[in-house]
Amino acid sequence: MNQKKPPVSKPPSKFAQWLSRASGSLWLRTVKIVAGILLVVLLVFYSAAALFTDQGGFTVSIKDAGKGNAKYGAISLSETADFASPTVRLEAQEVARMTNISELDIPADVDNYDGAHNGANYMAYTFYLKNSGEAACDVLTDLRIDGVVKEADEAVRVRVYKNGVPTTYAKLAADGTPEPGTTPFEGGKKVLSELSEDLAPGEITKYTIVIWLEGNDPECLDNIKGGSVKMSLMFSVVEDSETQSET
C-alpha cells in the first residue's frame, strides 16, 4: 500500500511576509498610541488632584471669650445642638486634595449633618452658636480670609447656611460684577460681616459652612494649581452704651 508523501510547505510569499511585518508594526504603533493616551489621562488626573492641595484651615471662635460681662457677653459654640460640650473655639477638618467642582455637586442635604462632614472636593462644617447669658445681646459675625496661596481665592465659593437659609459668597468677577448666584465679598480679605440683633437668652443659631473651588468660574485656571485658602469665622458680642456703662 503506497503512502502519500507529506505536503511540502511552501515558503510564505513576499506579500505574506510584508503583510506580517505590516501587521506587527501596526500593532506596535497601536500599543504606543494607547499607552500615550493612558499617560495623558493619568497626568490630567494627577494635575486635577493636585489642584487644591492642603486646602488650608477653617476655625470658628469667640472674640475676647471670658473677658466681657458674663451677664451680657456669654456666647458659646458647639458641634451639637444639645451643647453637651460647649466651647469658645472649633476647628474644621481640612480637605487634603481638593479639585474644582460645580455647585451642583454639593449635596442638597449638606445642612443636615453636625460637625465635620466633608466631601471629596468640598469642606462642610456645621456648628451652633448659643446665647448663654441672662439677657439678649447683639452678635457680630466676621468671616475673613487669613491666608491665600496662588490666588486660589479668585475661584473659591463660601456658602453660609444660617438656620437653614443659604447665601453663597465669592470675589467679584474680573469685570467688577458679582459672579452669578453669589453675594460679593465685602472687600479685601473680608468675606462677610453681619450683625445679629437681640439674640435671646438660650437662643441657638445653626450654621453650616461649605467651601469649594468653582470650576465654572473664569478665574479657575491652571495658575491656582497647588493653591490654598485659610479662613476664620469669629463671633463677638456688641455692647451698646448702656451695657458698657454696666461693665
Residue ranges of model-derived segments:
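Short, hydrophobic/aromatic beta-strand segments
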Residues: A135-I145, A152-A155
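Short, polar/proline-rich extracytoplasmic segments that appear immediately after membrane translocation
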Residues: N2-I106, A116, E239-T247
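A surface/secretory-pathway sequence property marking extracellular, secreted
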Residues: I62-E91, V148-K189
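Short C-terminal domain-edge/linker segments immediately following a structured domain
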Residues: T141, R157-Y161, E239-Q244
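Short edge beta-strand segments in beta-sheet-rich domains
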Residues: Q55, D153-A155, G226-S232
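C-terminal, structured domain-capping segment
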Residues: D105-C137, K189-T247
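Acidic (Asp/Glu-rich), glycine- and aromatic
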Residues: L143-G147, M234-S236
